[in-house]
Amino acid sequence: MSRIDDLLKHMTLEEKIAMLAGADLWHSVANQRLNIPQFKVTDGPNGARGAWGGMATPSVCTPVGIALGATWNPEVVEKVGNVLADELEAKGAHILLAPTVNIHRTPIAGRNFECYSEDPFLSGMIASAYIKGIQDKGKGACIKHFVANDQEFERFSISSEVDERTLREIYLEPFRIAIRNSDPWAVMSAYNRVNGAYACENDHTLNDILKGEWGYKGIVMSDWFGTYDKGVPSGGLDLEMPGQARWMSEEMVKRALDDGPLTEEILDDKVRRLLGVLEKAGLFGKPELNPEGGEDKPQHRKIMREAAREAIVLLKNDGTLPLKKVKSIAVIGPYAAQAQILGGGSSSVTPHYAVSPFEGIKNRAGKKIKVDTAPGCHIYKSLPAPAPETLSTEDGRVGLSLSLFNGTEFGGAPMYTEVTPRVNQGWFDKSVPNVNQESFSLRMEGFFTPKESGVHTLALSAVGWCKMYLNDEVVIDHSSDADMGKQLVAEVELKGGKPYPIKVEYYWKGSPRWRSVGIGHQPPQPLDLMGEAVKLARKSDVAVVIASLNGEWESEGFDRVDMKLPGEQDELIRRVVKANKNTIVVVNVGSAVEMPWIDKVPAVLQLWYDGQEQGNALADILFGDENPSGKLPTTFPVRLEDNPAYINYPGENGKVRYGEGLFVGYRYYDKKKVEPLFPFGHGLSYTDFKYSNFKLSAKSITPKDKLTVKVDVTNTGKVTGKEIVQLYVRDVQSTFARPEKELKAFAKVEVKPGKTKTAAFTLDREAFWYFDAAKNAWNIEPGGFEILVGASSRDIRLNGAITLEPEPRAARFHTGLTVGTLLDHPESRAVLSRHIGGFLLMADMNSAVGMTLEQVASNHPNFVPQKLLAQIEQELAQIK
């Protein structure tokens, strides 16, 4: 008997039920009597964060999801997964709540930066590598959010109204691919509803498809607080998070057992899955969970830099890049000198370090090239934290002294102390050890030493009550309930280089929820911020403008309102390029943005939120130390109105209709002949590649066969480069609506100057199938198909044709034959007459005779339902 079977045999009903919800925010429930340990989860996907907010230990910060998608390189992504497994070990955790594989349905969705692509195949393959990298090292991944969680607007309640074929081919497909390839330990259900039923208890998606059709054996956990009613225990969910139990409580589960449809057999299956995670993690017989920590390892830095480089996409280049023979560089933009490497929300981590574009460029330039910076404009909605080097403790350490006390009076010995440069603190649930979550106080104190003299703006924000003191005088009083959640500011005249005593006292009283306190600062500003940047650009050989979004504009919890760069960044770019024709725009965002200045600038790089090595990776590309090799994993439309979801987004009356159906991203732009700003798969190089010698292993295949496709890629330039060869399939003769082409394979090949590499692909039946909703099955329609290879979805270099023959059947007669063929033979004609004679008499026989009986059934399900079709198939098979 296995360990799991033995434990199930000895567990009481109450002990089984207790496992179905978390113990707290991050842990499963342990069972002391049976020595069942607990596992720990932590947020991702941009790192393994550990505890929330200011108490978080430092972590590796990876490039965000869309950046990993832009690498088109599963090998590199797998290495990133290996690093994240190490980080999980350092955090004492076992499962990373990642990857996020929702689809880029609209370019303004708040969490697009977390997700890989608009294409389900690319998403699934990148997710497979990410999961494999984590799980090969004995840790687990939790793929999310299952399913159709593609916007933040009304995300806790909106119903994604999506037809079955689109659900299968687009939104479920990345999950199916990743589960088939890498078998993640866990799947996280989404907050939203899918066709009316909440995703956390959706019988069709969780039980019928995930656990039934796909045979998934891992656990299904809820998103945090993402359970809603009494249907949860029987709806396919295994673990309600976080604890304490609400809908998976002993009372609710016992009621579901009494009333049905929950059975003890289903309950045992849930517990078996949870015990299976503990076994995979090797936790039985292990000591207590490790405390959280973090280690900044050289090999991790190397992998982060490699991934960051491979993610950068060269969108446009009129010969300006790579930089050569320059003596001065102006690095301009609101985040030129500050590393903006994350969107907002639960994916955020506290990085060990972060290299800004200015820092990376300056370090690479050395002493012979003068590098200066200017912001040009600001885009923050709230003042950012003071620079760490301006904060110090009494003994000279960087940061402020932080102390936490029980009660609201700052009395007695502190329960927790540390010195931290992180002056934006946040707490959620039970993140702070030994502190009364319903009544505590905090003090941050030390010295603030401004870099320059003049009028400085200090800021204080809080969910709670607090005051800021400077020189022992209150400068900001944030103790009014009316100011809860707001940032209050005060202007003070300060002398540069002089240390000023600063103190913030904060307290909380009430039920535990999200609580926070943060300090902001803005130094004296020039009267003409943009003018200063333009002057710098004019006197420099090259201007590099870092155009950005940030976590205030692009975040979990809300969608963007448009595709525009916030603030005055478009105007800044126009003025800088007018002052210096050698202007390079570097777009530091997590999704598509409008670029009204695109025709005016000679070079554009897509940087993304590129992780802790952002600045170094950018410098590698700018100076030509590395050749850009990223390609867009999502289409950049010219304007928001061009995107296929525009008409139906955000929805109304609690529903959002996925009216574009299959035609998401490039599938839509191809079908409607709409010219995008930059197409899916686009990305330039510092060299050129020639495609040749296109070969197909056969001209005719059956669905059981595999097709080998080969193409030679020659580097015709002067530097080594990597090309992403993209293979698309087009159904030439489909009865059903099909996209113009669909990505079915890709390969990233590195080729030296003058050399040739062969990219080889193997296609199986999945490259040709579509989902037939009438049959509730994947189907392959015989006929002509085109195999296309190219450098992007709009840059097809070579193509070839194949014929897909019908799958051989043992029976002489079957429903895959045309109606005309079946009517030509007396025995088969008798079967048709007996079952659908009336329909055939009234049908348009000119069109019907050329269709297979299966196609007739699909087109006319009311007259030829699937049950009847199966009966006809059975009778036809009996004809000798």
Task: Please identify what each model-predicted range represents.
Residues 808-876:
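Compact, charge-rich alpha-helical regulatory domains located at protein termini
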Residues 1-457, 461-769, 785-788, 793:
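Glycoside hydrolase catalytic-domain context in secreted enzymes
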Residues 764-807:
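Terminal connector regions
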Residues 1-22, 804-816, 847-849, 872, ...:
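Mature N-terminal, pre-catalytic/accessory segment of carbohydrate-active enzymes
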